[in-house]
């Protein structure tokens, strides 16, 4: 009998083969792709990923039991998968350079999904596509439009770096143990105009400032952090100084991050 899912690792194992096949299909795997699966567990997704015929397959597994199982007893037809015992939150995603076409997939634990997507989508320069199953509520935040209740820092960040695509909803009964909420599958295609390393740091800072006080006006939020008149800075960008953070588009946040950084050192 396989071990029980570990609550400490946020494990909910997918048991529906049709759903697993649909998730793997969202990655659009080709024969030249190098694929990373996060948290393969018993291998529900792994089978379908391998069947798609990628050039290389890497399994990132934090659970010692499942890492050992994949090494000692690889799934039928998957002997060349490379198993890496690691925490995906600590993985050096910046090493996924453009020398290879990288694609990343996973049924992400609810408790670490947001920081994982934040890092992967912004730090992996060679990323071609990603497909993740996450909590439905988090998925709704990611694709939320400016001005909506769900729109926040995660929405802006991921929309600056990728084009998120809502794929489909996954009900609780296809997992063991059964979660209390619905899941959703989203796919991510990197933008060609995504922020560079310097812009990323500035964007992260301004998002942190703004969404920690999302109900305040932007001029009030930024006043302690700019070298001059916050209202004038915002007006110069075509932004209403009385606007609140959730009304700005991702593109406006990139511009605001640059302006705030320049103002602070002027």
From Swiss-Prot:
Q: Alphabetically list the UniProt keywords.
A: Cytoplasm, Methyltransferase, RNA-binding, rRNA processing, S-adenosyl-L-methionine, Transferase
For this chain, the family text in UniProt reads: Belongs to the class I-like SAM-binding methyltransferase superfamily. rRNA adenine N(6)-methyltransferase family. RsmA subfamily.
- Source organism (scientific name): Nitratidesulfovibrio vulgaris (strain ATCC 29579 / DSM 644 / CCUG 34227 / NCIMB 8303 / VKM B-1760 / Hildenborough) (Desulfovibrio vulgaris)
Check the record and name the SMART domains matching this protein: rADc
> PANTHER family, per this entry?
DIMETHYLADENOSINE TRANSFERASE (PTHR11727), DIMETHYLADENOSINE TRANSFERASE-RELATED (PTHR11727:SF7)
Q: Which GO terms describe its cellular component?
A: cytosol
* Superkingdom assignment: Bacteria
| Entry GO MF terms | 16S rRNA (adenine(1518)-N(6)/adenine(1519)-N(6))-dimethyltransferase activity; RNA binding
InterPro entries, from UniProt?
KsgA/Erm, rRNA_Ade_diMease-like_C, rRNA_Ade_Mease_Trfase_CS, rRNA_Ade_methylase_Trfase_N, rRNA_adenine_dimethylase, SAM-dependent_MTases_sf
- List the subcellular locations: Cytoplasm
- The principal location of this protein is cytoplasm
Enzyme class (EC, first level): transferase
HAMAP family named in the record: 16SrRNA_methyltr_A (MF_00607)
Lipid biosynthesis among the record's keywords? Answer: no
The protein in question is named: Ribosomal RNA small subunit methyltransferase A
Residues recorded as binding S-adenosyl-L-methionine, renumbered to this chain, are 12, 14, 39, 61, 87, 107
Q: What is its EC number?
A: 2.1.1.182
The catalysed reaction is: adenosine(1518)/adenosine(1519) in 16S rRNA + 4 S-adenosyl-L-methionine = N(6)-dimethyladenosine(1518)/N(6)-dimethyladenosine(1519) in 16S rRNA + 4 S-adenosyl-L-homocysteine + 4 H(+)
């Amino acid at each position: 009998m396989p071990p029980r899912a570990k609550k400490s690792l946020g494990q909910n194992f997918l048991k529906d083969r049709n759903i697993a096949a649909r998730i793997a299909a969202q990655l659009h795997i080709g024969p030249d792709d190098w694929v990373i699966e996060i948290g393969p567990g018993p291998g529900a997704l792994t089978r379908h990923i391998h069947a798609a015929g990628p050039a290389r397959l890497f399994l990132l597994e934090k659970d010692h039991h499942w890492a050992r199982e994949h090494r000692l007893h690889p799934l039928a037809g998957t002997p060349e998968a490379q198993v890496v015992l690691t925490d995906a939150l600590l993985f050096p995603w910046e090493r996924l350079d453009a020398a290879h076409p990288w694609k990343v997939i996973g049924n992400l634990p609810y408790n670490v999904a947001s920081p994982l997507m934040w890092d992967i989508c912004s730090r992996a320069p060679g990323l071609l596509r990603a497909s993740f199953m996450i909590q439905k509520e988090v998925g709704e935040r990611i694709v939320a439009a400016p001005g909506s209740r769900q729109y926040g820092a995660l929405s802006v960040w991921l929309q600056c770096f990728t084009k998120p695509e809502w794929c489909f909803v996954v009900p609780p009964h296809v997992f063991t143990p059964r979660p209390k909420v619905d899941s959703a599958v989203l796919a991510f295609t990197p933008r060609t105009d995504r922020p560079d390393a310097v812009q990323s740091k500035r964007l992260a800072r301004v998002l942190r400032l703004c969404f920690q006080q999302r109900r305040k006006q932007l001029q009030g939020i930024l006043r302690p952090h700019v070298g001059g008149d916050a209202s004038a800075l915002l007006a110069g960008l075509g932004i209403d100084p009385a606007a609140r953070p959730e009304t700005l588009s991702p593109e406006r946040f990139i511009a605001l991050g640059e302006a705030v950084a320049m103002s602070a050192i002027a």
